[in-house]
Every structure is written in structure tokens, then in C-alpha cells.
Swiss-Prot record:
It comes from Rhodopseudomonas palustris (strain ATCC BAA-98 / CGA009). Residues 10-20 have a biased composition (Low complexity). It comes from the Bacteria. Belongs to the UPF0301 (AlgH) family. Residues 1-24 are annotated as: Disordered. This is UPF0301 protein RPA0913.
Amino acid sequence: METASKRPKSGAAKKPAAAKARGDGPSYLDGQLLIAMPVMEDERFARSVIYICAHSSEGAMGIIVNRPAGSIDFPELLVQLDIVEKPEQIKLPDHAESMKVLRGGPVETGRGFVLHSSDFFIKDATLPIDDGICLTATVDILKAIAGGTGPKHAILALGYAGWAPGQLENEIQENGWLHCDADADLIFGDDIEEKYDRALHKLGIEPGMLSAEAGHA
């Protein structure tokens, strides 16, 4: 699996939540949210909330859901990807016009990844993850959204975050990340700037308290 060129660094802080177990095997985090600790040294992941799409003994892959990709919007991206030739050719439903383009991570930043609700599915292209959330990374879903036949809820990210085998587990043990159950309202919500605090609140943690405790084992 492709991984970021630099590993997220972390310091000592509160222990992460319990991971999901698969029978008697290892615990993996598919379908959960990673929440960066305040001591995260890698600016690419500072205050990031990452939805884990795949996690196994071979590594992990996730999408940052709270980092805008600059000022680019969905219609502009459709033109850049040559899905349409001119902006005036785009006729988007309201939910697509307001869809945020996010910076999903430092790997394959020129490629688009769409997290979306399970009411849309492309055979051999859509990956069901957990709790009605799926991942599709083909231009077909962008065309469907642009034409009003796409999923009800979606976010589009450029790039993804990747970890080598055992890397994510080590970072969690080093207290670089907290994790919690995901929910669609948080992932697909428009309040990008509030997602980090909302994720901490799911664990019953006040952001200010966490910052004060960071660095104290």
C-alpha cells in the first residue's frame, strides 16, 4: 500500500478509545474516525479528523474529512478533470453545488476520492465500508453527481492518508491519535471547521482540556 512520505508524529496524551475486534483476531479501525492529538508535529495532520476506509495487517487508508482543498469548488474541479468543457455546461442539484472539495491526504493528491451514502453503488468500483458509508474513486460518480443521479450525501477529497503495515498501530500506541465511532452527520456535514471539536465531543472530551493535558503521560 502507498503511504505518506512522512509519518505523522505524536506525543504522550490521553489513551485512544477501544478498537473494533474481528472475532478473535486483531482489532482494526475500518469505519472509525481518527482524531489527531494536539501534539501532532506533522502539519499535514494537525487537528485532522480522518475516516478510516480500510485497515488490515497490510496497512491502512483513510480520508481527511475536515481540511478544505483551498478555494476550489466542485464545479471548478469538474472542469479541471475534463468531465465538462465549460462551467456553463454544469447543471448541478443544490447538494452538489455546495459539496466541499477536501484535501484527503498527502498520497495521490491528483486523484479524487468520494465518500458517500450507500444509496449509490457502482459494481466493482464502490467499496462499502461501514454504517451506510461507501467509497468510490472513479469519474463515474462525479458524472452522476453532476447529472443529479448521484448519492444523497457525499464529500469529494483529493488524495488520501496511508499507513504501512503496523504503522498506524504504532502511532496509536504512541498516543498520536484518538479514535471513535463515525457518524454520517459529522462526515458529510457542512461545518468543516467544527468537525474536530465535534469528534472530540463524541468521546466526551473538551478540546481545551485535551490541549492542557497534552504532553503529560
